[in-house]
């Protein structure tokens, strides 16, 4: 049997899964509802942070090329793996808006897909900025300014320093974080040094995760708490997680399935408005819909691979 190989980080994929569960939970699609785990946008902040972290390295080869190729890469690299389920989700939201009255609580033009659209717009803007500004340190200064502005909007009276401002800031934090060298201990005994490095990174990951979960679980809402989570603890989680070589098929599955937990919330809007009008009652529908979208995506990707293999054989 061939050895399973993956470039994905298992701990990041695990947190993707937990954050997708968190989003569905706060949208009310769980049998048990609680007023704890405040800050429904925090998991989306984490998604933005991770996207920014991996963005700089992936976009480098397009900095000197065509603008349209770069923007195409920004869009296609984030949708190619699940394009058919994304089309299904977008179509269901569009149909829901046509059939039922607009309700800002659940049913607005993009609904739960706003994250994908915002990510595409923000990353495209950052890509254009990278093409104009050739010196990395100037780009980093601009990222620092964006972070300060986006995480200080509450000072201007904007409630909860709105989502649209937090997204660019979290992407900027991710891009700056990706440039920080990894912690590596140097000793004469290389194996011992590697083990010590992994141990220190693991401790950092556990502490960052534990503090973030503790602060999130507190029922009170405080600006300082969200700033601490967004600027220190979430970056700490990503930094230490990407320094630990945890990989495996199980973690990749969780990361892949997290996308469909997120997307599945769109098709069940139709069922919600037509029948139940109760988000808790949609829990089982959400589970079934996520599994169906996951199966469709696996089938589509399998067909793509088969076609590619047949073309390679024919050539």
For each of these PLM feature ranges, what is it?
Residues 57, 61, 130, 175, ...:
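Short glycine/serine- and small hydrophobic-enriched flexible loop segments
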Residues 115-119, 163-167, 227-228, 286:
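Residue-level hotspots within the lipid-embedded alpha helices of multi-pass solute transporters
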Residues 32-33, 163, 272:
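Short, solvent-exposed loop/turn elements at domain surfaces
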Residues 56, 121-126, 174-185:
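Internal transmembrane alpha-helix with an interfacial aromatic "cap," most often the third helix
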Residues 152-178:
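Hydrophobic, aromatic-enriched interface-forming segments
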Residues 143-150, 166-169, 228-234:
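Alpha-helical membrane segments in multi-pass integral membrane proteins
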Residues 1-156, 192, 198, 257, ...:
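Membrane-cytosol interface segments of multi-pass membrane proteins
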Residues 49, 89, 171, 175, ...:
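Alpha-helical transmembrane segments of multi-pass integral membrane proteins
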């Amino acid at each position: 049997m061939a050895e399973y190989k993956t470039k994905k980080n298992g701990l990041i994929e695990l947190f993707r899964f937990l954050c997708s569960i968190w989003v569905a939970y706060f949208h009310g699609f769980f049998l048990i509802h609680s007023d704890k785990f405040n800050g429904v946008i925090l998991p989306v902040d984490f998604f933005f942070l991770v996207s920014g972290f991996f963005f700089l390295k992936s976009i480098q080869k397009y900095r000197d090329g065509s603008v349209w190729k770069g923007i195409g890469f920004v869009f296609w690299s984030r949708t190619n793996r699940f394009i058919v389920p994304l089309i299904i989700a977008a179509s269901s939201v569009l149909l829901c808006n046509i059939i039922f009255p607009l309700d800002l609580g659940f049913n607005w033009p993009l609904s739960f897909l706003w994250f994908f659209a915002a990510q595409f717009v923000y990353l495209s803007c950052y890509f254009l900025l990278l093409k104009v500004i050739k010196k990395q340190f100037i780009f980093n200064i601009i990222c620092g300014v964006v972070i300060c502005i986006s995480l200080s909007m509450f000072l201007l009276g904007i409630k909860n320093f709105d989502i649209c401002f937090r997204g660019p800031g979290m992407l900027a934090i991710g891009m700056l974080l990706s440039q920080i060298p990894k912690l590596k201990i140097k000793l004469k005994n290389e194996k011992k040094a590697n083990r010590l490095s992994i141990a220190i990174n693991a401790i950092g990951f556990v502490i960052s995760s534990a503090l973030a979960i503790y602060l999130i679980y507190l029922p009170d809402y405080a600006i300082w708490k969200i700033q601490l989570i967004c600027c220190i603890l979430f970056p700490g989680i990503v930094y230490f997680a990407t320094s630990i070589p945890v990989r495996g098929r199980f973690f990749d599955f969780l990361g892949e399935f997290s996308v469909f937990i997120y997307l599945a919330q769109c098709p069940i809007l139709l069922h919600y408005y037509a029948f139940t009008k109760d988000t808790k009652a949609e829990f089982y529908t959400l589970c079934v819909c996520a599994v169906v979208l996951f199966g469709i995506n696996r089938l589509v990707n399998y067909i793509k691979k088969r076609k590619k293999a047949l073309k390679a054989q024919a050539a």
